[in-house]
Swiss-Prot record:
Domain of life: Bacteria
Phylogenetic placement of the source organism: Bacteria, Pseudomonadati, Pseudomonadota, Gammaproteobacteria, Alteromonadales
Organism (species): Shewanella denitrificans (strain OS217 / ATCC BAA-1090 / DSM 15013)
Name of the protein in question: Ribosomal RNA small subunit methyltransferase C
Gene encoding the protein: rsmC
Any one of the GO CC terms: cytoplasm
CDD domains noted in UniProt: AdoMet_MTases
Amino acid sequence: MLSNSSQVILRNSDYFQHQDVLILNYEADTLGLSLLAHAKSVTALALDFNHYLQLAAKEQPQLACFFGHTLPSSFAGKTFDSVIVFFPKAKSLAPYLFELAANHLNIDGQLMIVGDNKGGIKSVAKLIPDCFSAPVKRDNARHCLLYTCQLERQGRDFKLENWLSQYSLSTPQGEIIICNLVGVFSEKHLDLGTELLLSHLPKLEGRVLDFGCGAGVITVALLKAMPKLELECIDINAMALASCELTLQANKLQAKVYPSDGLTQVTGAFDAIISNPPFHDGLTSTTDIATQFVAMSEKQLKSKGIWQIVANRHLPYASTIAQVFGNFDVPAENNKFKLYACRKK
């Protein structure tokens, strides 16, 4: 099953005949495989680990798939005939992807941008670097828009630091430095949920997991308070993981940072799991994911292991936590968030 955006790309497959094609911000389907009927080769970069896993299972000699915020170093200087960019949900990420595209596109090569027509893509002309020609709308179907333009001249060298903001953050554990790449959630002050969590941290020791680490706020606060922790940080988003690693470096701290689709890539048992899980909108699908997170995280805890999360108070966590863990406490709450704490039997 192809997403609407991917279906629009396939409608325009004549553009890719016998070409080497790069896809940036790859979505969760098998478009890469379908394009091989037209293109010479397809290389895909997924920023979401779940999206990567779906295509990685289909890899073959002319189809390569990678996860990360950039292509591997072996692709430095490698250029393609066409680059497809899936317009990101975080609009601030779009110029980053366009500059990355420019660094991997032949001069006069084609950039294709596709996205939901209500997802911000209509502002593409304001976001494209001036090394490209003006984008032209080529298709409007499946509630999506497709734009194309050409690389007229070489753009500036791609440097990650051009897309990084760094700032100090006051936490209950003291001042910390946060490194935030575009597209990663940031308020440049401690959000109310994380503040509630950090203000009521239990004493921890041993192996601890920060689920949905984002830019590393909770990670660094934990290590500031308890530097002997064996901390592991997971997220599904490549920009978040890169931000977390940079945040750790800036604070001269160390932790294991790696991608995981939920808790699927996590191995072994933990003494504690601490999280401000990224499930906020209250949709049925989100509630289901949150429910799965509770059940799976209990299985990753050692006996007597500590589990503590902060969540929007309207999300129905309580019944699931009671069902999975039995008893639980609410050490603190405010008008927006609740802190849930329990210990595995």
